[in-house]
């Protein structure tokens, strides 16, 4: 659920359209991209709610088959149980590439912060 303060402070003032859904299966056919995250135990006020909800939003191959053929699945990793390992073999599973891209971005950011020069040419090392 989108927290009320985000709805009131951000979504409504900017007239950003959104809708909340309960069923992953009902939503998958309409999505262009699926960004999965784990159900975060530390965000729940009580253990009972976490236990009741933690297994509802699990993506497996059966559910993924409901999605568009070109819909990428993203996830920040590491995962817990929210994406079945069988999904890893599906060409839409883009989370490993996502992690690799993130690694390269961090490397480029660090390199640009170091402001290095090439010892042979004396020129600044460019990040591109």
Predicted regions, residues:
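Short glycine/proline- and charge-enriched loop/turn segments
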Residues: 13, 44-49, 88-92
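Glycine/threonine-rich flexible loop motifs
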Residues: 38-57
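Amphipathic, non-transmembrane alpha-helical secondary structure
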Residues: 25-29, 61, 111
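Gly/Ser/Thr-rich active-site loops/lids in small-molecule metabolic enzymes
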Residues: 52-63, 98
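Short glycine-/small-residue-rich Rossmann-like dinucleotide-binding loops
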Residues: 32, 38-40, 77-78
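Adenosine-phosphate binding glycine-rich loop
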Residues: 70-71, 76-128
């Amino acid at each position: 659920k989108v927290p009320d303060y985000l709805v009131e402070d951000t979504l409504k003032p900017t007239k950003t359209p959104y809708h909340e859904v309960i069923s992953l299966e009902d939503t998958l056919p309409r999505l262009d991209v699926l960004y999965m995250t784990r159900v975060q135990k530390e965000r729940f006020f009580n253990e009972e709610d976490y236990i009741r909800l933690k297994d509802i939003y699990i993506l497996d191959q059966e559910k993924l088959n409901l999605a568009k053929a070109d819909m990428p699945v993203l996830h920040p990793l590491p995962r817990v149980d929210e994406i079945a390992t069988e999904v890893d073999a599906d060409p839409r599973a883009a989370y490993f590439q996502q992690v690799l891209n993130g690694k390269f971005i961090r490397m480029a950011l660090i390199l640009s912060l170091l402001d290095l020069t090439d010892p042979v040419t004396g020129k600044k090392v460019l990040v591109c």
